[in-house]
């Protein structure tokens, strides 16, 4: 089949780029041809080595907009979305199936007012999770699309329903792991003999309360050598200055800081270089949206310390690390201390669980599940 991907989200890198890459490379491995359709001004941050079709209408970014500008940008994006949908419908002879890899209920709402809903080819919208507050909007839009059986909503989640609800055009499947694709890497089968390297990676923003985390880490007692590596990329000057202040403040505390953005092979080498990953993020949305860093850890088979609202279904099935009660800083310190001190005796437990999780959520299995949804029998409604 010739699989088309419609991508309209411009990002400097990270999980969005890697997710598209999974679709491209895994579907190619299954014998399919892949092409992209993108807005006229779209700039790729990675060369997927695929043909590209351009659509009239500029991609809109919210990164530097606020207030009225943000409202104007949102309105402009909705207008352009209808233009893109119409053009995709007109060009459907150029592909056998269409995937929109990062969608929300707004995409479906717009589809209900577009000729694209009558497409003759399988069209799959991938939603990366659904919050309780938006579930009714999602189901309302999905119900209206039931007469159009070429339209499928693929929800990345755990289980076979969305808050106990099912529709014939909604397909829950597990998300894929992120794996090293540009470096030679084999998961370690040995417990580290030197210092246990724990990585805390991601974008730094002042509201993340990094200093509280560092103070908790430094206050505990460890029975083995340990090194904390903190990587932070910053988008705004005020965040950059604040991160530099923190680096200076903790310069003599045995913590390694990396103030830089990491993409591609650099990012992969950084993840591969540590023994475990720290994920202290606490927010209700993590219960409903799959964690990109958690599925990076599984893909690289790195044990984790994470809050208990980080995809709890995964931890119920696989002991890939330890969790602490979300938002409880004291418990984070206690769990982190025991994780480090007991790492040697628990490492084989983690390894077995990570191998099993990596197989269950592998990119190969993800592509197989998505292909099954795309190729299922359809009849135009």
Question: Where do the PLM segments sit?
Answer:
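A short, active-site helix/loop in glycosyltransferases that binds the activated sugar's phosphate group
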Residues: 132-172, 177
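A short, glycine/small-residue-rich beta-strand->loop->alpha-helix junction that serves as a flexible
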Residues: 7-21, 44, 205-208
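Conserved donor-binding/catalytic core segment of Leloir-type glycosyltransferases
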Residues: 189-208, 214-221, 228-229
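Nucleotide-activated donor-binding/catalytic signature segment of Leloir-type glycosyltransferases, i.e.
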Residues: 240-268
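Nucleotide-sugar-dependent
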Residues: 279-295, 307-309, 313-314
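A charged, aromatic-enriched C-terminal amphipathic alpha-helix characteristic of glycosyltransferases
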Residues: 14-15, 327-330, 341-377
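Glycosyltransferase donor-sugar binding loop
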Residues: 42, 227-243, 260
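Nucleotide-activated donor-dependent transferases that construct or modify glycoconjugates
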Residues: 1-13, 102-104, 199-200, 278
């Amino acid at each position: 089949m010739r699989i088309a991907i419609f991508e309209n989200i411009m990002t400097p890198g990270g999980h969005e780029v890697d997710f598209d890459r999974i679709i491209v490379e895994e579907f190619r491995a299954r014998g399919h041809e892949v092409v992209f359709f993108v807005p006229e001004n779209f700039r790729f941050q990675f060369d997927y080595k695929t043909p590209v079709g351009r659509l009239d209408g500029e991609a809109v970014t919210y990164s530097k907009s606020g207030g009225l500008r943000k409202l104007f940008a949102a309105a402009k994006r909705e207008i352009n979305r209808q233009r893109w949908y119409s053009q995709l419908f007109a060009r459907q002879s150029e592909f056998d199936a269409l995937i929109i890899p990062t969608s929300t209920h707004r995409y479906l709402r717009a589809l209900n007012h577009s000729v694209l809903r009558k497409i003759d080819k399988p069209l799959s919208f991938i939603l990366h999770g659904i919050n309780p507050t938006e579930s009714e909007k999602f189901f309302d839009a999905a119900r209206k699309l039931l007469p159009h059986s070429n339209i499928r909503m693929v929800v990345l989640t755990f289980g076979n329903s969305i808050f106990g609800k099912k529709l014939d055009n909604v397909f829950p499947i597990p998300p894929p792991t992120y794996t090293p694709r540009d470096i030679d890497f084999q998961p370690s089968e040995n417990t580290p003999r030197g210092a246990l390297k724990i990585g805390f990676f991601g974008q730094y923003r002042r509201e993340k309360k990094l200093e509280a985390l560092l103070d908790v880490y430094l206050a505990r007692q460890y029975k083995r050598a340990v090194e904390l590596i903190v990587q932070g990329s910053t988008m705004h000057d005020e965040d950059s200055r604040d991160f530099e202040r923190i680096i200076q403040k903790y310069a003599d505390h045995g913590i390694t800081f990396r103030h830089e953005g990491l993409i591609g092979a650099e990012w992969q080498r950084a993840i591969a270089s540590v023994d475990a990953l720290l994920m202290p993020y606490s927010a209700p949305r993590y219960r409903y949206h799959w964690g990109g860093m958690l599925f990076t850890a599984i893909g690289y088979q790195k044990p984790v310390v994470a809050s208990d609202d980080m995809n709890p279904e995964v931890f119920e099935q696989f002991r890939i690390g330890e969790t602490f009660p979300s938002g409880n800083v004291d418990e984070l310190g206690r769990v982190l201390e025991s994780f480090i001190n007991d790492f040697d005796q628990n490492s084989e437990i983690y390894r077995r669980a990570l191998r099993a999780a990596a197989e269950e959520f592998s990119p190969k299995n993800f592509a197989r599940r998505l292909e099954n949804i795309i190729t299922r029998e359809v009849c135009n409604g």
